[in-house]
């Protein structure tokens, strides 16, 4: 009798198991349609356009890989790639260093700490256009406050964004000012998660503040630094609004990144096919940079528990 009931139960369970996957489709199909419509189709269409010579007002003509072969010989594109790499490297490194230093400071107790922490994160809340307008006035060679501050400490004035040699460093200064607070918040979250026991042991052993940071804090916050670096890298490499609002890629093309050159090709010269090829290569560059950062994480053995081997 028991065996008969068991057999019936098993048959019923087998039927339910057999039909269960079918019930999932009404929930999966809408998501698949959205993915196809929003992600896959635009990329497929972009790749298709990159294989054609297509200028606004004329029909597309298939040219194969001609647009891609044109890229290495395009001096302006090569220059924009170099500008993008320099801008990205500086815009990642400086906020990481300064944000970590700020996090260490705000992790200690001092009067009005909450007030100063609130002031510190204000730059990341401002809109890019407002930031660009304020910094453009500050960068003015004659009327800007930055040259006034330089004169107060006996340093010569600078042309800032109005000179090719200092345009990108000046833009990095704006990027650092805006996004150092974000790095500070991420790293501060890691510091506050560290238990107090290792610090107490280090204090008993007579460790200096630098030794405490180097051998306790820094290994523990490595995963948080990686997250901050990844966020900053992706954001910096595709930066457009602040650069366009302050310099528009100038003087000349001294601060023109890939994004700005892409904008010129697509919306000034209306070369849609060539612009599509730039988009594909630009996306590949972002993937390569993200992959390099992930590889660095694996090589240094960063893990969820913190630490670097």
Predicted features, each with a name:
Residues 1-19:
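Short, Lys/Arg-rich, polar N-terminal cytosolic tail immediately upstream
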